[in-house]
Amino acid sequence: MVSQRLEELAAEFGLVERALGDPAMLADPREYARLTRRHRELTPIVTLYREHAVLSSDLEGARELLADPDMRELAQGEIESLSARLAQIEAELEVLLLPTDPDDAKNVILELRAGAGGAEAALFAVDLLRMYTRYAEGAGLKLNVLDASESDLGGASKVVAEVTGEFAFRAFKWERGVHRVQRVPATESQGRIHTSTVTVAVLPEAEQGEVSVDPSEVRIDVFRSQGAGGQGVNTTDSAVRAVYRPGTPDEIVVVCQDSRSQIKNREKALVVLASRLAERERAAREERERETRAAQVGTGERSEKIRTYNYPQNRVTDHRLEGDAKNFALDSVMAGGLAPIVAALSRDERERQLLELQGAEGERGTYGAA
């Protein structure tokens, strides 16, 4: 029942408020930050829930006045007004009660890999990185390149970056998948349009203790930094390569060379490694769930083409959307204007979840008193 869920959240809200008011909580910054985020998530829900309880009581009182001929007309107007507001609150609560992604508040490990198209794909990877950097800045986030494999003509065959800030994963999670570009390369003398691809992976950054990595299974190599992220620091062995289970099918290689400090590069490399291991575990778990329910899940698969950037027509098409809603102005998107696409995808996801919630509940309006 919705009312039971709201009662549970109201009780949790009280516990969170009391915990935040405890001076001893300041000794644990990580837990304090977690509780602060949770308080922020619960506040709009509990505020509406309490308003619903007050208005429900007022509505009951107004209905009692219908028996009084002198008050009937006034009561009827009050009933209509209260009923309209209650319906609005219930609709808002339905949306707020939709399941949230537990990874939304995490930082992001962003990986771009040039695919089909050779040098042109590598150039487009740099264009996407520039787009993401501008998008991050506009969203109040920070994007920092950890490692990049430069290619000819100023492209990059691979880029690994970290995006930090409040709800970074929520801002970037829709970017995972294959991005296709259609344009005339600078090296094309005949003016022919080429099609190239870049694969983007978006990993929620693993938090401390989330994934256990056995140090004996990781080989650490150090070398002199070079290329993007390493300029000016290549006089010492500050770059770090972490190799998980080297020489086995499970091998994972992570390189970090953005800092002048070998210690900091090592720490960041291990964070990226843990994030990849967590993603591997999530992917395996999701695959088992798909096999169990014998269903195919499309949106979000890394191998899926999610978006096409058509330069001749100045159009970006997101293939997860439908109709005219799937097309956006390319120049705006490449300047970092991803927010409209993210909003449209998030809206579609909420609508899908809402339909599932309504189907599970069977009926609406089951809201109890606070």
Swiss-Prot record:
The molecular function GO annotations come to:
translation release factor activity, codon specific
Gene3D superfamilies per the record?
3.30.160.20, 3.30.70.1660, 6.10.140.1950
Region entry Disordered, spans: 284-303
Q: Which GO terms describe its cellular component?
A: cytoplasm
Q: Which PROSITE patterns match?
A: RF_PROK_I
Residues with the modification N5-methylglutamine, per the entry, are 231
Q: Where is the composition biased (Basic and acidic residues)?
A: 284-293
Q: Which UniProt keywords apply?
A: Cytoplasm, Methylation, Protein biosynthesis
Q: Which Pfam families match?
A: PCRF (PF03462), RF-1 (PF00472)
Instruction: Output the InterPro entries linked to this UniProt entry.
Output: PCRF, Pep_chain_release_fac_I, Pep_chain_release_fac_I_sf, Prokaryotic/Mito_RF, RF-1
Q: How is it modified after translation?
A: Methylated by PrmC. Methylation increases the termination efficiency of RF1.
Q: Which residues form a coiled coil?
A: none
The answer, when asked if Manganese is one of the entry's keywords, is no
Record's subcellular location? Cytoplasm
- Per its database record, what is this protein's job? Peptide chain release factor 1 directs the termination of translation in response to the peptide chain termination codons UAG and UAA.
Q: Which family does the record assign?
A: Belongs to the prokaryotic/mitochondrial release factor family.
| Name the record gives this protein | Peptide chain release factor 1
